[in-house]
Amino acid sequence: GLTTPTEKIQDTGRLQLPEEEHYPYGDFHPQCWIYRQYGGNHGWEDLADALRDSCNIYFYTMGHRLGIDKIDEYASLFGLGEYTGIELPEVKGYVAGPATSEALGVEWYGGNLLNAAIGQDNTQVTPLQLANYIVTLLNGGDHFVPHLLKSVKSSDYSETVYEQQPEVKNHIALDPANVEAVKRGMWEVANDPKSTVDQYLSNLAVEVGAKTGSAQVGSADKEADAVFTL
């Protein structure tokens, strides 16, 4: 594989590659949010650390290694930018990539890969797609079709008139060690004092994991929209 759950990536504030590796993005050195806001960095981070801290540099680095084709392949397998199949009107949205840019009539540049790696650029997904993606990841790779109705009972609850059977759309082969690292990172988001949101989630009646996100609105003078998955 291209990495392991325990590999640590150094966040110095701006994306840098090892000296012996060609840097293909010209003068574009995207920054981590902590550098933009506070002039700081996260130092050395593994996968769980990066999830807890939303370390852009870690995921820029992974995006660089994967390439946009592999990112788009897995995004589709997890149902991002695809119809979920729920019994409601829905939109597919987009996952950033050369084909999406062409369809939208905009230019695709190599550096767009880095923005796509953190869910930005032209990526637009629905809350249900996001939730179903997390479920698929954490259950070990079974991508289910979501449904509104679980079952129908008779008026006295003595009989089940209808019961929706689980419907697996596809299965993704996931390394259990990787899944456990993601679970640990999401647990730390909700419970580790180093997290920016643990104060809101660590004392709930039910122990939870979470992931924060920022849906940027394309304007520097407007606040980004916050998104949470629990």
Predicted regions and their residues:
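Beta-lactam-recognizing serine transpeptidase/beta-lactamase-like catalytic domain environment
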Residues: 2-230
